From Swiss-Prot:
Processing and modification events after translation: Tyr-161 forms a radical intermediate that is referred to as redox-active TyrZ, YZ or Y-Z. C-terminally processed by CTPA; processing is essential to allow assembly of the oxygen-evolving complex and thus photosynthetic growth.
Name of the protein in its database record: Photosystem II protein D1
Residues with N-acetylthreonine modification: T2
Record carries keyword Aminoacyl-tRNA synthetase: no
Residues under site feature: Cleavage: A344, A345
Binding site for chlorophyll a ChlzD1: H118
Name of the coding gene: psbA
Amino acid sequence: MTAILERRESTSLWGRFCNWVTSTENRLYIGWFGVLMIPTLLTATSVFIIAFIAAPPVDIDGIREPVSGSLLYGNNIISGAIVPTSAAIGLHFYPIWEASSVDEWLYNGGPYELIVLHFLLGVACYMGREWELSFRLGMRPWIAVAYSAPVAAATAVFLIYPIGQGSFSDGMPLGISGTFNFMIVFQAEHNILMHPFHMLGVAGVFGGSLFSAMHGSLVTSSLIRETTENESANEGYRFGQEEETYNIVAAHGYFGRLIFQYASFNNSRSLHFFLAAWPVVGIWFTALGISTMAFNLNGFNFNQSVVDSQGRVINTWADIINRANLGMEVMHERNAHNFPLDLAAVEAPSTNG
């Protein structure tokens, strides 16, 4: 009788860590991107919760008029927000150690910059983690590509726009009413509703919702019944089954007769590519539009573009929008400007004496 003994190679601590990080057998895949994603998202989430509850007012406009955003300072879930970093800080990197005290850091809105930078790094790593897991499993990389749309949108409003405008105080506040305020001010200053890229984004979001509802309802309505009338049709499905769970021919025929033949897909793969690509491309365009308007390449201006034979202006909807924009703009930062922005931009005369 012969016994064969094999020496088990001892793996270093670093090697075991690498194997654990890249293992697809874990309940939740970590990945190398996850090593950075986990601490950054935990930091952003923790600081957001603490600041939303208890942060003191922030001097957002840099004029010594603090704005309250937390629950303990009089706000509720709807009105509360993480107030953006002060205009006095501008685009400066403003960690806690750059302030003379924690009170000063809070007064100047340091938590906003901390949350935003950690959040953007975290969601970018989440996108990389999606690609990494797809690669490990031998899948195609399109899940990460689709997720790049919301990552691009978040980067546009939280980073690119403040860079273009010269201050993190112009970034989107982290709250419900703060988001709406950002949208209103953005329209007033950049006329985003008249920007073609925003129009493509609206078509992408609403069109994607419509197509998703149509697809889900068609599939649900054309299930291949494996149960009796007294049982739920869902009981006839078994996870991992090889058979089709719905009849695409029936769905194609229904939709083709409802509209016209070529309005429906007869290829499931091209159908699902379309369902993914439509909203993703639309949101890409919106993020690109925000990034261009950040540097004041604004929406179309058709103000007073229609006149009669006597040269008198015939108002169009573009003029109505322009009037609304002016009203919103004069209400924005009303204590920060003594003059309209266009007049305030003129160089002041020098004084001698």
